[in-house]
């Protein structure tokens, strides 16, 4: 299937926060309760519709172990979007967000869109990180924020698509050089219009990116 743009994503965060499960739920609409640890990187892709345009999302799921951090860093380059994931039942995964964020911003484009995800919202009774803490971290660092459940699929679709909406908004504003694939964006065969157009009504509508969305 042809597409207007290809956006490259990277999923980052500690081991066991559910990165691979989020990818599987988004691409295959299924949950795998037992998942082998990611070694290096895994890959998935899916087409979505943003503002009437077909967008191909190319998603790289990275290993969370410290021993693979150098490999992960190489994938930041050329990523238009990042999903930074923590587990709401494990505070240490939230405490490590600053380190992951520093890595991401040091090795990526300054315009990369970062979505902060508090995963495993289905385990409310075991919650160790308040939603308000995630919201505050996102505000402080200029991130989009959502809580998700890879198990129930709650907000999984929205997290990936809202990240794409924000990337597309930046394209419309001229913040991304879409002719430089190092920015994680590739022009597809569908896309022939100039990317230097100003904000449109549809673009302005896309700014409602759901940072306050509830879960289930």
From Swiss-Prot:
Bilayer disposition of the protein: Lipid-anchor
Binding site for Mg(2+): 20, 38, 61
Residue ranges of the region described as Disordered: 189-216
Motif Switch 1 in this chain: 37-42
Residues that bind GDP: 16-21, 119, 122, 150-151
GO BP, one annotated term: positive regulation of exocytosis
PROSITE patterns, per the entry: RAB
Regulation acting on activity, per entry: Regulated by guanine nucleotide exchange factors (GEFs) which promote the exchange of bound GDP for free GTP, GTPase activating proteins (GAPs) which increase the GTP hydrolysis activity, and GDP dissociation inhibitors (GDIs) which inhibit the dissociation of the nucleotide from the GTPase.
This protein's UniProt keywords: Cell membrane, Cytoplasmic vesicle, Endoplasmic reticulum, ER-Golgi transport, Golgi apparatus, GTP-binding, Hydrolase, Lipoprotein, Magnesium, Membrane, Metal-binding, Nucleotide-binding, Phosphoprotein, Prenylation, Protein transport, Transport
CDD domains reported for this sequence: Rab2
This protein's domain notes: Switch 1, switch 2 and the interswitch regions are characteristic of Rab GTPases and mediate the interactions with Rab downstream effectors. The switch regions undergo conformational changes upon nucleotide binding which drives interaction with specific sets of effector proteins, with most effectors only binding to GTP-bound Rab.
Homology family: Belongs to the small GTPase superfamily. Rab family.
Protein's UniProt name: Ras-related protein Rab-2B
Species of the source: Homo sapiens (Human)
């Amino acid at each position: 299937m042809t597409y207007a743009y290809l956006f490259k994503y990277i999923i980052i965060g500690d081991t066991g926060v559910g990165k691979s499960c989020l990818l599987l739920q988004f691409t295959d609409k299924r949950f795998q309760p037992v998942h082998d640890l990611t070694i290096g990187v895994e890959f998935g892709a899916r087409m979505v519709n943003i503002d009437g345009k077909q967008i191909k999302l190319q998603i790289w799921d990275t290993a969370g172990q410290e021993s693979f951090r150098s490999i992960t860093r190489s994938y930041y380059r050329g990523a238009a979007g990042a999903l930074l994931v923590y587990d709401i039942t494990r505070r240490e995964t939230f405490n490590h967000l600053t380190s992951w964020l520093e890595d991401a911003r040091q090795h990526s484009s300054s315009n990369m869109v970062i979505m902060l995800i508090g995963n495993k919202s289905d385990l409310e009774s075991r919650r160790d990180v308040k939603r308000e803490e995630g919201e505050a971290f996102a505000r402080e660092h200029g991130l989009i924020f959502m809580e998700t459940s890879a198990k129930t699929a709650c907000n999984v679709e929205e997290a990936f698509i809202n990240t794409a909406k924000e990337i597309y908004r930046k394209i419309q504003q001229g913040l991304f050089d879409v002719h430089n694939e190092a920015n994680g964006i590739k022009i597809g065969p569908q896309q022939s219009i100039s990317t230097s157009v100003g904000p449109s009504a549809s673009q302005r509508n896309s700014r409602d990116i759901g940072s306050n969305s509830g879960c289930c």
